[in-house]
Amino acid sequence: MNQESISQSIAIVHPITLSHGRNAEVWDTDGKRYIDFVGGIGVLNLGHCNPAVVEAIQAQATRLTHYAFNAAPHGPYLALMEQLSQFVPVSYPLAGMLTNSGAEAAENALKVARGATGKRAIIAFDGGFHGRTLATLNLNGKVAPYKQRVGELPGPVYHLPYPSADTGVTCEQALKAMDRLFSVELAVEDVAAFIFEPVQGEGGFLALDPAFAQALRRFCDERGILIIIDEIQSGFGRTGQRFAFPRLGIEPDLLLLAKSIAGGMPLGAVVGRKELMAALPKGGLGGTYSGNPISCAAALASLAQMTDENLATWGERQEQAIVSRYERWKASGLSPYIGRLTGVGAMRGIEFANADGSPAPAQLAKVMEAARARGLLLMPSGKARHIIRLLAPLTIEAEVLEEGLDILEQCLAELN
């Protein structure tokens, strides 16, 4: 693979060149087939080249390929926002805007939060990931490699421990850390918003403690602080339902969307309480390419397939296959390096750990390389890159899913 014209600051996980894909399978330019457990890093919940999405893209490309919504509205943008207002399960009137990416959605949410509250400080969480733009870098709960050598970042942003059964941080410990933050470093009246993922993606598929989310919601409601929930990776069926936040027992004030919203086309959104989305002056939100007609058409075709029944069926099938395999591997002692199973629904991660519980990223790397040689693509996550995240399309055929898990099992067995 010739990379001479590619920035060497871009890290490439798999040194192959892809040619085409179908549902949960891709082929490289040499004709080698791979089962895809990466899914474009969570973008392809409905699979590669989903027929309905492709048809929608082709049809829209013959009608209108671009028009800046700020200059003149177009039908696909309007239709998609109407669909999203019905698809997002909240109790309040919802409004929003479309963006080109998840990071851009996060950036705009920060603007809205500051504009609506008149406050500046944002509180994020250890292990979180919200994008690669300058402002979203500061939200990320990890320095290397994202924040290295880029200098001062927009703020102020503060970080708290992420309470989860997967991190070992309890609700009580996180609340104590929050109390300390407000007594030592930051005046609570300066806080505009908290931002978090209900299930951390880059962090290793770690699920937030619902008790903490509910305590935080009460805390914010009493003080006029907003909650921004990032469902960029966990949304659109990944956890077996439309979004992951309902399992927390709270509603967000602002919600970030992207990845599987549009079947592989670049699109994001920030949606939330209608009064918040009107807090900035006219012209305060927008973008030349935001809500491109072709991306909107792809999103409409995607949402049409994401019925509650479909999402539950797809998610349960994949969850059962992964969990049953994992339990069998642990019970049989397949490999001493198999640690915890993280995540929710079909959003699952497998931790690699040494006997003393410390991360084992080198062993994960060996499994990824061996799996690729056998025709399975995997993706690492976690602070130490020691958790494999399983992101196969939800629409993967049962036999292809089992074939992929068979390959993973063979590679795990070789670690012995």
Curated annotation (Swiss-Prot):
It catalyses: L-2-aminoadipate + 2-oxoglutarate = 2-oxoadipate + L-glutamate; 5-aminopentanoate + 2-oxoglutarate = 5-oxopentanoate + L-glutamate. The keyword Iron does not apply. Disruption phenotype: Inactivation of the gene leads to a significant growth defect on D-lysine and a relatively minor growth defect on L-lysine. Deletion mutant shows an increased concentration of intracellular 2-aminoadipate. Pyridoxal 5'-phosphate binds at G102, A103, Q233, T288. Pathway: Amino-acid degradation. Its EC number is 2.6.1.39. Its cofactor is pyridoxal 5'-phosphate. One of its GO terms (molecular function) is pyridoxal phosphate binding. InterPro entries: Aminotrans_3, Aminotrans_3_PPA_site, Class-III_PLP-dep_AT, PyrdxlP-dep_Trfase, PyrdxlP-dep_Trfase_major, PyrdxlP-dep_Trfase_small. Induction: Up-regulated when grown on L-lysine, D-lysine or 2-aminoadipate. Gene3D superfamilies: Aspartate Aminotransferase, domain 1, Type I PLP-dependent aspartate aminotransferase-like (Major domain). The modification N6-(pyridoxal phosphate)lysine is found at K259. The keyword Transferase applies. Keywords: Aminotransferase, Pyridoxal phosphate, Transferase. Belongs to the class-III pyridoxal-phosphate-dependent aminotransferase family. Catalyzes the conversion of 2-aminoadipate (2AA) to 2-oxoadipate (2OA). Is most active on L-2-aminoadipate (L-2AA) and shows only weak activity on the enantiomer, D-2-aminoadipate (D-2AA). Shows moderate activity on 5-aminovalerate (5AVA) and weak activity toward 4-aminobutyrate (GABA). Is involved in a D-lysine catabolic pathway. This is 2-aminoadipate transaminase. It comes from Pseudomonas putida (strain ATCC 47054 / DSM 6125 / CFBP 8728 / NCIMB 11950 / KT2440).
